[in-house]
């Protein structure tokens, strides 16, 4: 398949159409095709096409947001880490926030939908456990510039899509992925992070692919070794059977019953 031509066609349609929902579905479908054919592509090609598709999808999501009159794309609850009182807070577009703004000591509860978090320090991000609605068919999560935080998502509110974490340091990342679906996890520029990526159901046999790039001293919990495939795009000589000790390793560490505040106190 000529992914370059397909991506250019999506970019052309984005500049001409107002039917962003249909274009979003086509883009997600192309991402699925890329994942299916990834074994026949070089690491560079996979990374290049994946980045281009994600950029198109990000532009489509922005257009969808604008077309809805800047309605909120998701809702979460926010509280100071010193307070037990949750307050409903409408999302502000992180892309418009000044790059120097850093949020300190906040607790975010993800409830549904596409989500983006940026410039957090000594914060926690968890997913609600009492949500009774249906998960969306597709979506994306993005975390950027995260320092000394706990990301503990035991539920993700879409069935197919991607999680992208970049520029993350000294943090704890727990994810529960629906591995029976087309689901992409990408980690870029992570340093000294402890990571636990579990499957939605222990009965799911397929492995979850995790793409990493420019990562350093990251620890994946040893219990996840059998169901993860780590693809290091910074190391073209790495195979699925080996790990680059300077980038990542599988080791045991205390998961603190997956309790967010216990993790925060234990490691941060």
Swiss-Prot record:
Gene3D superfamilies linked to this entry: 2.160.20.70
Top-level taxon of origin: Eukaryota
Residue ranges of every copy of the C-CAP/cofactor C-like domain listed in the record: 98-255
Protein's UniProt keywords contain Zinc: no
Classification lineage: Eukaryota, Fungi, Dikarya, Ascomycota, Saccharomycotina
GO CC annotations on file: cytoplasm; microtubule
GO molecular function terms listed in the Swiss-Prot or TrEMBL record: GTPase activator activity; molecular adaptor activity; small molecule binding
Protein's cellular compartments: Cytoplasm, Cytoskeleton
Alphabetical UniProt keywords: Chaperone, Cytoplasm, Cytoskeleton, Microtubule
Functional note: Tubulin-folding protein; involved in the early step of the tubulin folding pathway.
Alphabetized PROSITE patterns for the sequence: C_CAP_COFACTOR_C
GO-annotated biological processes: post-chaperonin tubulin folding pathway; protein folding; tubulin complex assembly
Other information: Present with 1630 molecules/cell.
Protein's name in the database: Tubulin-specific chaperone C
InterPro entries, sorted: C-CAP_CF_C-like, CAP/MinC_C, TBCC
Keyword Transferase: no
């Amino acid at each position: 398949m000529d992914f370059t031509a397909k991506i250019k066609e999506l970019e052309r349609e984005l500049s001409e159409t107002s039917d962003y929902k249909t274009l979003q579905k086509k883009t997600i479908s192309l991402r699925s095709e890329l994942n299916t054919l990834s074994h026949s592509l070089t690491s560079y090609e996979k990374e290049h096409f994946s980045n281009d598709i994600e950029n198109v999808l990000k532009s489509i999501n922005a257009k969808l947001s604008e077309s809805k009159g800047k309605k909120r794309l998701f809702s979460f609850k926010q509280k100071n880490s010193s307070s037990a009182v949750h307050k409903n807070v409408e999302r502000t577009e992180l892309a418009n926030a000044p790059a120097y703004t850093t949020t300190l000591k906040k607790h975010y509860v993800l409830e549904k939908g596409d989500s983006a978090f940026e410039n957090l320090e000594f914060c926690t991000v968890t997913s609600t456990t009492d949500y009774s609605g249906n998960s969306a068919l597709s979506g994306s999560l993005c975390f950027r510039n995260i320092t000394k935080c706990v990301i503990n998502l035991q539920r993700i509110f879409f069935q197919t899509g991607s999680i992208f974490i970049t520029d993350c340091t000294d943090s704890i990342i727990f994810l529960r992925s629906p591995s029976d679906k087309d689901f992409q996890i990408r980690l870029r520029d992570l340093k000294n992070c402890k990571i636990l990526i579990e499957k939605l159901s222990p009965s799911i046999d397929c492995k979850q692919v995790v793409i990493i790039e420019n990562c350093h001293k990251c620890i994946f919990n040893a219990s996840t070794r059998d169901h993860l495939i780590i693809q290091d795009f910074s190391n073209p000589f790495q195979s699925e059977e080996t790990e680059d000790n300077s980038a990542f390793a599988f080791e045991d560490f205390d998961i603190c019953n997956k309790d967010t505040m216990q993790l925060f106190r234990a490691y941060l």
